[in-house]
Amino acid sequence: MSKRDYYEVLGVGKSASKDEIKKAYRKLSKKYHPDINKEAGAAEKFKEVKEAYETLSDDQKRAHYDQFGHTDPNQGFGGGGFGGGDFGGFGFDDIFSSIFGGGARRRDPNAPRQGADLQYTMTLSFEEAAFGKETTIEIPREETCETCSGSGAKPGTKPETCSHCGGSGQLNMEQSTPFGKVVNRRVCHYCNGTGKQIKHKCSTCGGTGKVKKRKKINVTIPAGVDDGQQLRVAGQGEPGINGGPSGDLFVVFRVQEHEFFERDGDDIYCEMPLTFAQAALGDEIEVPTLHGKVKLKVPAGTQTGTKFRLKGKGVANVRGYGQGDQHIVVRVVTPTNLTENQKNILREFAEVSGNMPDEQEMSFFDKVKRAFKGD
């Protein structure tokens, strides 16, 4: 019959401390001791608890058990050498990984590491994106706990060097292979690879050394930013780990649409209405731009769709490469609801032009009947 997991037997997790393992053993040994518990199977359970405790309370045995479980790494190599037996619960991948360094090349858990980057989405008006601005934003991020100065330990105490790994954050485990014994390095499960153990945790941060706070950051938005672009604010991300540098803050811009202007890169586009008289006779009109009103001369005979350009009236290039232009497309508006006098003037114009229109007024139903008759 296969043996139960020792951690399961004692009812503790795999990262349990020695004190937690000892406490669990005392409770269960008292419960199942043959002199106290006369139920059938109690003696076997007591034996199982004792065996689990003897293994997990010994650092070397525990490390060996964590590596191999209940399997004996030497089994399968008795008198027959390689013949017929298995390799003690591990495969050739594990063997070669250990021998040739695959398992040893691990990042030092105590090495300085850069903090995580943060992202903040900012909504800008059309004009704010065009001209830029200075603003203050507030972001939630982790800060060093002021109570413990980031140590994670209760004030008046300090983290202690892990007695199991000597502060390295790693344990050396001896592994038997068909090629001999190999020493493999694993993350120390007593300190989770930190090399430190905190016996008395800070009540403010719970031992993490960090607390969540909202921080105000001044941001200078350059002129010419566009929708979807982002601004990097160096060093304003999450704080570094083990003395490493802080991460960065990335501000992503969302630019609102304008009711009159449209933007394409650094250029601005808009439509301007012209009356029939303005288009035919020409005129000087006022055109709104981001920089104020500008006079534009419209030549006589201008047609719908004619384009004009106002140089330098667009958006500044965000990288400083000049200034965009403003493009104007004119639309000639056909007059409606004419007075009789206006109609007479247009009739005169049409007659002089030799293009007198047919002004027969028909009802909608008359037009439908005429269409069916083919008139």
Swiss-Prot record:
Residues 5-69 form the J domain. GO terms for cellular component: cytoplasm. Zn(2+) 1 binds at residues 145, 148, 202, 205. InterPro entries: DnaJ, DnaJ_C, DnaJ_domain, DnaJ_domain_CS, HSP40/DnaJ_pept-bd, HSP_DnaJ_Cys-rich_dom, HSP_DnaJ_Cys-rich_dom_sf, J_dom_sf. Signal peptide: none annotated. It is found in: Cytoplasm. Belongs to the DnaJ family. The J domain is necessary and sufficient to stimulate DnaK ATPase activity. Zinc center 1 plays an important role in the autonomous, DnaK-independent chaperone activity of DnaJ. Zinc center 2 is essential for interaction with DnaK and for DnaJ activity. PANTHER family: CHAPERONE PROTEIN DNAJ, DNAJ HOMOLOG 1, MITOCHONDRIAL-RELATED. This is Chaperone protein DnaJ. The lineage of its organism: Bacteria, Bacillati, Bacillota, Bacilli, Bacillales. The gene is dnaJ.
